[in-house]
Amino acid sequence: MEYKQDIETAVSRATDGKLRTDNWQYLLDVCDLVKEEPEDGAQYVMEAIDERLQQADANVILRSLSLVACLSENCGSRVQQAVASKRFTGLLYYLIEDKHVHATVKREIAKVVDQLSSSFQRDPSLKGMSDLLQKIIRRYPHLVAEPKLPQKREMSADAKLQEDQDLEEALKLSLQEYEQQQRHNGGQPPQQAPAALASETSLPEQPQPQIVRRVKAIFDLNASEPDELSFKKGDVITVIEQVYKDWWRGLLRGKVGIFPVNYVGVCPEPTAEEVAKEAAQEHAVFAQAGNVENLLQKLRVSQNVDVTHEDEISELYSTVTPLRPHVTKLIGKYAQKKEDLASLREVLANAEATYNMMLEKATCYSSSNFMPSTQHRTYQPSGQAAPYSNYEFSQPSTNVLPPRPASYSVNPQVTGLPVHQQRSVPENTEIRYRSYSGDLPHT
């Protein structure tokens, strides 16, 4: 009897409605208990799961389905036979047909049935799960089939033109809105020509085209190509641009890729009233920070006092307690903003590193084209006497990048060469004299 209670307690903990995701440690704890006595454990755990599946809390049902899948994969044939039994498959189908069960729960049931059917296909005695899957496919095909990936077809010229026009119109309306805001804030209205004023008053007010900035994934997607974006159901993707007719490019957790539009839903942008309401609620939460600190300080001082008789403490507590859900919501909001900013920083850092690398390569390529030859050479003007061969020119030993050829020059007082010949001698050229006893010729 104690063993049965342990299993029921473990099942209740693993399928708690307060859990927002599967806790695999709790799930494996149930599996460990069932493995201790496979015969009785399989019976007790399935009875506890049946009871949990009949509750109205959708979250409890979702956690119970995850527990069923975990038990089927880890606890042997006894549990598998109980899961594939006519009684349990009938309970799952009852949930599929129940109108009060949410569509998300029904899709999860169909997903688990599909998974178990694939796991049980080698054992004919577990055919009940595959029969249930076929029954769901026949009567509720929308619960099993995920949308097909659309083809990557190029946008037509008209579609691209329409997109450019929508963007131009959006920018125009944004500029007008900014100018109106400047006037409303007390700034001087910008001077406009009479023709512009006439055209502005004559044009009817056009609705601002809706620009999709964020979308929310409604299905899981595992990328099959390098340029595609992988995501999980519930992820919020920032839309960058439309690449193909049915594919967009987006940003998620620092990664950029394309994704199909039929796998996501548009996140509507909040209206001005909603933004103002949210800001007011946030301000109200932060305004209560002093009361929270005051309550904490009084509780520290009154540790040995019965707080139920302290009216001030009771009043403060009743004031700050309703703030908990709002604080939790704000934590989630700013956590998402932090993640978005971290992703943006990562993308910006990668772009900056790529740009610097390309700039460095371009600089090295340009430098190599302007590097003069470092070979030792002797200067001898044509048509001159033999003594000129005694002047020898060589590049300096230091590795200095020379300037452009247009700035090359040599001091004529040092060389004594004609001006039209001095331009061909690079700057910083060393002149080494050999023994010469005669005078330089005069030009």
Curated annotation (Swiss-Prot):
Compartments where found: Endosome membrane
Function, in words: Component of the ESCRT-0 complex which is the sorting receptor for ubiquitinated cargo proteins at the multivesicular body (MVB).
Q: Which organism is it from?
A: Eremothecium gossypii (strain ATCC 10895 / CBS 109.51 / FGSC 9923 / NRRL Y-1056) (Yeast)
Q: Look up keyword Protein transport and say if it applies.
A: yes
Which GO MF terms does the UniProt record name? Answer: phosphatidylinositol binding; protein domain specific binding; protein heterodimerization activity; ubiquitin binding
Q: Subunit details for this protein?
A: Component of the ESCRT-0 complex composed of HSE1 and VPS27.
> In the record, what lineage is assigned to the organism producing the protein?
Eukaryota, Fungi, Dikarya, Ascomycota, Saccharomycotina
Thylakoid among keywords:
no
- Signal peptide start and end residues: none
What domain of life does the native source organism fall in? Eukaryota
* GO BP term, example: positive regulation of protein maturation
Name the family: Belongs to the STAM family.
Keywords, A to Z, come to: Endosome, Membrane, Protein transport, SH3 domain, Transport
Q: Ranges for the VHS domain? A: 14-144
What the entry lists under CDD domains is as follows: GAT_Hse1 (cd21386), SH3_GRB2_like_C (cd11805), VHS_HSE1 (cd16978)
Protein's membrane topology: Peripheral membrane protein
GO cellular component terms, alphabetically, are: endosome membrane; ESCRT-0 complex; vacuolar membrane
Name recorded for this polypeptide: Class E vacuolar protein-sorting machinery protein HSE1
Q: Which residue intervals define the domain UIM in the entry?
A: 162-181
Annotated spans, Disordered: 178-206, 374-443
Q: Where is the composition biased (Polar residues)?
A: 374-383, 391-400
- Give start and end of each SH3 domain: 210-269
- PANTHER family this protein is in? JAK PATHWAY SIGNAL TRANSDUCTION ADAPTOR MOLECULE
